[in-house]
Amino acid sequence: MFQFVQRALLLILAALAVAGCSKQALSFKSVDITGANYAQAFALRDVQGQVRQLTDFKGKAVVIFFGYTQCPDVCPTTLSEMVKVKQALGSQGERLQTIFITLDPARDTAQVLKAYMESFDPGFVALIPTLDELPELSKQFKVYYRQQPGPTPTSYTLDHFAGSYVYDPQGRLRLFVRYGMSPDDLAADIGQLLRD
């Protein structure tokens, strides 16, 4: 009888172990970079002058994109797509925070950035590194940018990194989003993070 009880207990424990391990792994259209040891933190001023950190947005999925307001194509396209992502998430869209970090603090003043963000979504947050902070920040986030001269000293453009980073509601870096990914695919990925 003792052996029967012992075997029954072992079978129950084995079944529980299998059930506990049966949580389906998440599958993303974005590049899964869970566990990456870069792009982990920042402390930058927003357009109101308040210092913001990634931890300020705990409980939300966060998408971070680097750009500049005079960008002719990549930046407005990406921000327009983030509006669509938020809409595609429906009621969960309120748990998505888009953060735009300028690569052009010389021209992207708080006033300029505030108006720029409001033209897409007033809930988007713009952050402004100082010219001294920008090189280390770009290194930490593996963001390439390079100034290309224009006809006047202030009419330059920037070649820059066009991807985005996605953090889960616990503040962990999870995904790299390539430029041009469809808003519906990105919304599906973010939806998984919000439900996980």
Question: Which role fits each region the language model picked out?
Answer:
Residues 18-20:
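C-terminal motif of bacterial Sec signal peptides marking the signal peptidase cleavage site
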Residues 22-24:
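Bacterial signal peptide processing site
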Residues 42-62:
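A short beta-strand-turn-helix
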Residues 55-76, 82:
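Short active-site neighborhood of thiol/selenol oxidoreductases, capturing the structured segment around
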Residues 60-61, 77-101:
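Conserved helix-turn-beta segment immediately C-terminal to the redox Cys motif
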Residues 95-108, 124-132:
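Thiol-based oxidoreductase modules, predominantly thioredoxin-like and allied folds used
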Residues 114-161:
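Short, internal strand/loop/helix patches
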